[in-house]
UniProtKB/Swiss-Prot annotation:
The keyword Transferase applies. HAMAP family: Glycogen_synth. The lineage of its organism: Bacteria, Pseudomonadati, Pseudomonadota, Betaproteobacteria, Nitrosomonadales. It comes from Nitrosomonas europaea (strain ATCC 19718 / CIP 103999 / KCTC 2705 / NBRC 14298). It comes from the Bacteria. GO terms for biological process: glycogen biosynthetic process. ADP-alpha-D-glucose binds at K24. Its EC number is 2.4.1.21. This is Glycogen synthase. Belongs to the glycosyltransferase 1 family. Bacterial/plant glycogen synthase subfamily. Keywords: Glycogen biosynthesis, Glycosyltransferase, Transferase. Synthesizes alpha-1,4-glucan chains using ADP-glucose. The gene is glgA.
Amino acid sequence: MSSSPSRKNPRVLFVTSEVFPLCKTGGLGDVSAALPAALRELKADVRLLVPGYPSVLSGLKYKRKLAEFDLLPHFPPTTLFSSRLQINESVSLPLYVIHCPELYQRPGGIYLDDDGQDWPDNAQRFGLLSKMGALLASDASPLSWIPDIIHCNDWQSGLTPAYLHYHSGKKAASLMTLHNLAFQGCFPPDEVARLGLPPESFSVHGVEYYGNLSFLKAGIYYATRITTVSPTYAREIQHEPLGFGLQGLLAERSNAITGIINGIDNTVWNPATDPHIVKKYSSRNLAAKKINKLALQREMGLEENETIPLFAGISRLSYQKGYDILLQVAPMLADLPAQLVLLGKGDQSLEKQLVMLAQTNPARIAVRIDYDEALSHRINASADCFLMPSRFEPCGLNQMYSQRYGTPPIVHTTGGLIDTVTDLAPDTPAGESASGFHFHEMTADAFMNGIGRAIDAYYNTRLWKTLQHNGMRKDFSWRSSALAYLSIYSLLMQR
């Protein structure tokens, strides 16, 4: 919907299936709170639209009824509430909540039931989220506030641009952000009619994807513009294997795709103020890291030794995260000598093998099968080097956390890992802008070569401090990400 020429600040409806702290299963929940908050601090008028799960309704201090939709075609009776979500002391976000008891009021998870199975009516549940987003972003909205841009996130709101395409009146521009292309929201073709989409939409030039309806493909096909969560990932998804079958369409739309790195919360991830670590420090007193290192070695049952290089990993334990390769490397790493601390949970086979590995070498390897937020902070503050051998990584966060704490990462060259970690190349022995180490082939030998380069650098005190300082100086703030999104919003408002 075209904006007033006198109004420069965009009105944005941010549509998401999860937002921290009300409802979260992964990184999308964090992004959905942090990015809109950073945008509001830059004077964008951003409002959120979320489903009314039990945790959302119970987590709000108040809610005000805005509109009722008893006769919304193809969906159960629905009420739209407004509220506010307090993000920090200075920022709260206006929130629209879709209250539809038949679709959202139930025990279990956001996407899965108590048995870990997809809810059988997920097409309806997230079809309603998409439909309500499209309604509020058009001249059919019952509200006086109409957005210039509707910002959709992953498959759960992917039908929004499709609904807008088939709306004949005025409508907002749409932005589709792809956080993880592996999840595509595919459903049987009879859902097309049930969701109120016209029959002609079910074609290769529409929502059809290998004989099914794909919410994600719909968003990619119909959105005005597309963003991903890193520039490299934006290129990778236009080719196999990371296009997951959508690479042809994404390549066709390459001129509409922009990669923008996610940010991190610099107030939460700050070694100078972190309440979870033993000794606070900054780039001016990096020697304090050794105090944290000795404390972590003691906590994890490792030999206390401030000079031995301590490597660490914090991750979901999975094939995608490369932990099968790490399993091959860990015994070699312990023999160097070096130490290894791992924190995470996931694939049960990987969990068992890692625990057995730690039991065979308890002075050098420690494994905690869990996710512990406070411990993750202590690991970042204590380790000398962080390991991140992901096969693919749209953006990644831990490599940014580790650099913030003066802990150079070793990363596989994929996605956001390339964009956020500057390699110590062989021809730059002084360090220059380097902040970590890349390895290119997804093999134990290549990974071990990266670890070897890191150990050589670790024993060069001046070079190591350069790497630490370079990483700690990088700007991974959400403000930086928000400025990039504002540039995209500006393009959309000029269309």
